[in-house]
Amino acid sequence: MKIAAVYEAVTRSIIAELEQGAAPWVKPWKGGNCIGILPANAITGRCYSGINIPILWHAADVHGYPTNAWLTFKQALDKGAHVKKGEKGTQIVFTKRVTVEKGDTDEEKQISMLRAFAVFNVAQVDGFDAPDAAAAPPPPAGAVIEFAAATGADIRHGGDKAFFVPSVDFIVLPDPESFESVEYYHATKLHELVHWSGHKTRLDRDLNNRFGTNAYAAEELVAELGAAFLCAHLGVQGQLRHAGYIDSWLSLLKKDERAIFTAASKASAAADYLRAFSEQEEEAAE
C-alpha cells in the first residue's frame, strides 16, 4: 500500500470514529483484554510507537483479538508458523532515513520517509505460541504519583480547571476529590504532563496558540494521545478529556490527512521523554 493511501485510510477511519463521538485510542486501554498493554512485536518484544499504537489498538478492538502482540508474515514463517487462510494484515508504518543529494551540489542530506507494511495479530497465526493474553497486572497504587514526582514538574491544586501555564511553567489541577474517580484524576494529570513536556526548555512544541485554532487543536491531540500511551504504560483505567475537542479534531483531520501522524509522533516523543525520568531514578537506585 502506498503511503498516501495509508494516510487516507487511517485518517478516514479515525474521522469515522470521532463522528460517532468516540476516540479510537480510548477504548483499548479502558476495557477488555488490552488493559495496560501497548502493542508490541511478538518476536522482539519491542513496543510499537507513534501512529502505530492507535492503529493496532483499534484493529485489536474491532476484531476482538485477545492480545496486542503482532508479527510480520515473514516473522511467522521464520518461526515455522503461518498466517491463517483468508486473514488480512493491518497496515502500519515505519520511518526510514535515506540520504539524498542536495540540488546540483555534491552535498548530501538525510530525510525521513515513511514506508507501509502489514502485521498480523498472533490470533491470526497458526503454529505460533502466543504470549499470555491476560490483562496486565494492576500497577502499584502510587505509580502515577511516583511517575509525576520523578519529572520534577511543578503541580499545584485548586480551582475547577486543569491546565498548564507555559509562561510560568506550572500545572494546575483541581483537587483529587473533585474528580469522578481517582483514575480520571490520574489521566488528567498525565494529559497536563504531556503539555508540560512541550515547554521551550524541554521538547519545545508551540504552546502559545489561541483556543479554536488548528494549532491549538493539534496540541490537544498530542496531549490526548500522549496521555493514552502513558495510561496504557501505567495501567491507568480512566477517562480522557477528548469529548470537548472532537469537533476541532474533525476539522483538523479533514483539512490535513497527515495531522494524526504528526500528532502521534509528537505524543510518542512526549511519552518517551516523561518515562525517561522514572527510568533514570530506577537506574540510580540499582
What residue spans do the PLM features occupy?
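N-terminal accessory/interface modules of nucleic-acid-binding and processing proteins
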Residues: 1-286
